[in-house]
């Protein structure tokens, strides 16, 4: 039995929300000093990880709009699982690293809300199995979960 498009959309949205909740829980209770301490994830602070997540959503949002219009997604030209984003991440972090913590936390909520609203506007065809829109949504949820795990591992190592 195949699932109805509305059920599929709801499942994808729930997965996104669950992943974001895992991310939020991973840094819940940390002080401003702990959130901005470098070395939490590689050279990055937790704040850096969060602004990195915002930058990913901000990168993906125009493609969700393209897909909603029936246009081609720019990111669809690359294998998102195989591509190395190290140079892109470094360039974006050089621009975003000095943002204040309160702004990063605000943008984390805003970008997620914008992403969820964009997902709600997507036609069912973009959410079908093997469709790029579905992949983009799944990768975004996995991205939150991956970085939540990194933060939790750091907290365990630091006794936080």
Regions found by a protein language model. Name each.
Residues 1-18:
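Extreme N-terminal tail/first-helix region
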Residues 15-18, 22, 103-114, 142:
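A non-catalytic, amphipathic alpha-helix used as a structural packing/dimerization or gating element
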Residues 4-8, 46, 88-104, 127-133:
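Acidic/His metal-coordination segments adjacent to aromatic residues that form catalytic metal sites
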Residues 17, 36-87, 116, 121-160:
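Short, contiguous alpha-helical
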């Amino acid at each position: 039995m195949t699932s109805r498009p509305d059920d599929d959309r709801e499942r994808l949205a729930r997965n996104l929300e669950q992943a974001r909740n895992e991310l939020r829980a991973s840094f819940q209770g940390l002080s401003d000093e702990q959130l901005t301490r470098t070395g939490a994830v590689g050279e990055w602070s937790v704040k850096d990880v969060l602004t990195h997540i915002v930058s990913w959503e901000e990168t993906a949002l125009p493609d969700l709009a393209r897909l909603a219009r029936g246009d081609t997604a720019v990111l669809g030209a690359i294998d998102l699982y195989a591509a190395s984003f190290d140079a892109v991440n470094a360039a974006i972090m050089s621009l975003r690293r000095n943002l204040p913590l309160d702004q990063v936390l605000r943008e984390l909520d805003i970008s997620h809300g914008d992403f969820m609203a964009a997902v709600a506007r997507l036609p069912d065809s973009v959410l079908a199995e093997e469709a790029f829109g579905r992949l983009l949504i799944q990768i975004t949820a996995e991205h939150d979960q991956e970085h939540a795990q990194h933060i939790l591992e750091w907290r365990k190592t630091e006794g936080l």
